[in-house]
A protein has these predicted regions:
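Extreme N-terminal starter segment of soluble prokaryotic enzymes
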Residues: 2-9
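Active-site catalytic loop in hydrolytic enzyme cores
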Residues: 98-148
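Surface-exposed, active-site-proximal loop segments in enzymatic domains
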Residues: 17-20, 57-68, 107-109
Length: 148
């Protein structure tokens, strides 16, 4: 049986600044939530963001990680889940976050009911990122209501 699936992809602007991280993070989160609302209103079945959507770039220092990284689960995944539930939309949100007590480049998978149903941890980290982040150990696929 065929089924039409509406997919939205969103890439945030790339920004680099070591002195304006608070502002950049706030602006990126605003763009994330605004873009999701638009995708939801357009009937998107799944919306996918580009890598490290919550920052796009962060100067790699332990101080920055401790101060600016989000936790998974946490306030951002809760808000993403609320939007997913409101529009009955799956969301794949790549975030640089602390999950399970470890700094990871993770893609969070949220289903239509707003629940976090999976996480993929980036396996092959760039050298600079590998100094701080823990790589994933396997390539994963996830089942969604319309396919894998």
């Amino acid at each position: 049986m065929e089924r039409r699936v509406v997919i939205s992809t969103i890439q945030l602007p790339w920004r680099r600044s070591s002195s304006e991280l608070e502002r950049i993070k706030a602006e990126n989160l605003g763009l994330i939530f605004e873009s999701l609302e638009e995708a939801g209103k357009r009937g998107s079945d799944v919306t996918v963001f580009g890598e490290i959507a919550n920052f796009v770039h962060i100067p790699w220092t332990k101080e920055n990680f401790n101060r600016y990284l989000d936790t998974v689960p946490g306030p951002i995944t809760e808000r993403l889940g609320n939007i997913a539930q409101r529009y009955s939309m799956n969301i794949i949100a790549p975030l640089f976050a602390i999950t399970g007590g470890k700094i990871r480049n993770t893609a969070v998978i949220i289903d239509r009911s707003g629940e976090v149903v999976g996480q993929y941890f980036k396996v092959h980290l760039p050298l600079e990122e590998a100094k701080w982040a823990v790589p994933g150990e396997e390539i994963l696929t996830f089942d969604m209501d319309f396919g894998r």
